[in-house]
Amino acid sequence: MLTITLLGTAATMPLPDRALSAAFAACGGHGLLWDCGEGTQAAAHRAGVNLMRADAICLTHYHGDHIFGLPGLLQTLGAQGRTRPLALLGPEDLPDIWAAVRALTGPLPYPVKPQVLMPGQPLALDALSEGWPAGARLVPFATKHRVKSLGYRLELPRAGKFSPEQARALGVPVQQWKMLQKGQSVAVEGRTVQPAQVLGAPRKGLSVVFSGDTAPCPYYLQAAHDADLLICDATYALPEQEDQARQWGHSTFGQSASLAAQARAKRLWLTHYSPMITDPEEYAAQAQSIFPAAECGFDGKSITLQYEEAQP
């Protein structure tokens, strides 16, 4: 299962009930932090999210409302006793950003490993930590903002159903079943047994897309296809603001809803609201008229996604 929590839903400036952009994806004892705007730590405390679980911080771009919480968070993780490595992921210019952040934090008691990601080049999450499910990956995609920017699709695939009968027929000891279930081959009496020999057809996994700041674009639509949850830019509320949204590299409520409908996503959370939007719920009906499963995000909003069982 996969738990997603919105930590910050504000754009440009924090408000009393809205921290700046951040969301956390938790899977077992591991997690990913998407963006790290001002107020991320306090928002995580309020939401009961333990940021020590993060294996990586995934930055969509380097505007201040998405990264100004980073120096403080890195220092806090050190003060809390972190020693294991932390990946810092993002688009081009990450080395310059990391140099500036490191100058602010000073030495840290754990290694931070910056890594530039390129659109369309997946990152296997077991490269960050062995605790992720087999095949879990993070897929960056190009977005349409005023600077180089990325969105992220998190994918947790699910292997086919394990057949104990077939494993026994092949002489696999019970102690080795778990390895096959994790997608690893095993040696049995001088021969190799492959996972495909004891697993059924792959089952539907889970996928979550975090758009960052973006106007609608083909790469975003492709990445959003069949996602269980889209977390989407909704900086502007009204249809008549589409030209303004395009100019600044953002989306309206209606545009994000249209994209979710085209992508056949299951759920849409709107986020990254302009300070001019005092109550996002006032505009929710606009999005829901296009995509009924649209919801207004808020700081602390959370959902646990479960694997779907095949219908008989």
Residue spans of the language-model regions?
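Active-site-proximal loop/helix segment associated with metal-binding centers of metalloenzymes
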Residues: 15, 130-222, 229-231
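Cap/insert and terminal regions of metallo-dependent hydrolase folds
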Residues: 181-302
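A glycine-rich helix N-cap at a beta->alpha junction
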Residues: 104-117
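Short internal beta-strands
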Residues: 85-93, 231, 269-270
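Conserved beta-strand hairpin/beta-sheet module of binuclear metal-dependent hydrolase folds
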Residues: 1-47, 83-85, 152-154, 200-211, ...
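Active-site metal-binding motif and surrounding structural segment of the metallo-beta-lactamase
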Residues: 38-89, 114-118
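Active-site metal-binding loops of divalent metal-dependent hydrolases
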Residues: 9-10, 38-39, 62, 93, ...
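Metal-dependent catalytic neighborhoods of phosphoester/phosphodiester hydrolases
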Residues: 70-77, 100-101, 278-286
